[in-house]
Amino acid sequence: MTYHLDVVSAEKKMFSGVVQKIQVTGSEGELGIFPGHAPLLTAIKPGMIRIVKQFGEEEFIYLSGGILEVQPSVVIVLADTAIRGLDLDEARALESKRKAEAHINNSHGDVDYAQASAELAKAIAKLRVIELTKKAM
């Protein structure tokens, strides 16, 4: 069984097609969306979406956050920012991770620490998408 998936960012439509399942990080944890899933509307945390297409091929897209809407035959991901794994720059992601770690070590106060932690989580998520995209090739 399959369903239709649309992944849309503020800039463009990143994916539109028939899929077997997706995996994404919601506000309450990891979500696996299979055909016939109960209707759902939830926030998406920064991380990745793993798409298993109709014939088993996988694609990985980095999401900076957004909204997931699940209906019986259609799933829509409205992302703040979405970047395909192939389009991510590994050197840039490593540099972002290094800067965020330095910021955490030098943070002064809760707001500084929270902001640095969020930046670190985004950098780690990008690196994970890059790693999984390389493995899938």
From Swiss-Prot:
Disulfide bonds: none annotated. It comes from the Bacteria. Keywords: ATP synthesis, Cell inner membrane, Cell membrane, CF(1), Hydrogen ion transport, Ion transport, Membrane, Transport. InterPro entries: ATP_F1_dsu/esu_C_sf (IPR036794), ATP_synth_F1_dsu/esu (IPR001469), ATP_synth_F1_dsu/esu_N (IPR020546), ATP_synth_F1_esu_C (IPR020547), ATPsynth_dsu/esu_N (IPR036771). It is a peripheral membrane protein. The keyword Ribonucleoprotein does not apply. The keyword Glycosyltransferase does not apply. Pfam families: ATP-synt_DE (PF00401), ATP-synt_DE_N (PF02823). It is found in: Cell inner membrane. Its main location: membrane. One of its GO terms (cellular component) is plasma membrane. One of its GO terms (molecular function) is ATP binding. Belongs to the ATPase epsilon chain family. F-type ATPases have 2 components, CF(1) - the catalytic core - and CF(0) - the membrane proton channel. CF(1) has five subunits: alpha(3), beta(3), gamma(1), delta(1), epsilon(1). CF(0) has three main subunits: a, b and c. Produces ATP from ADP in the presence of a proton gradient across the membrane. NCBIfam families: ATP_synt_epsi, PRK00571.1-4. PANTHER family: ATP SYNTHASE DELTA/EPSILON CHAIN (PTHR13822), ATP SYNTHASE EPSILON CHAIN, CHLOROPLASTIC (PTHR13822:SF10). This is ATP synthase epsilon chain. It comes from Yersinia pestis (strain Pestoides F). The gene is atpC.
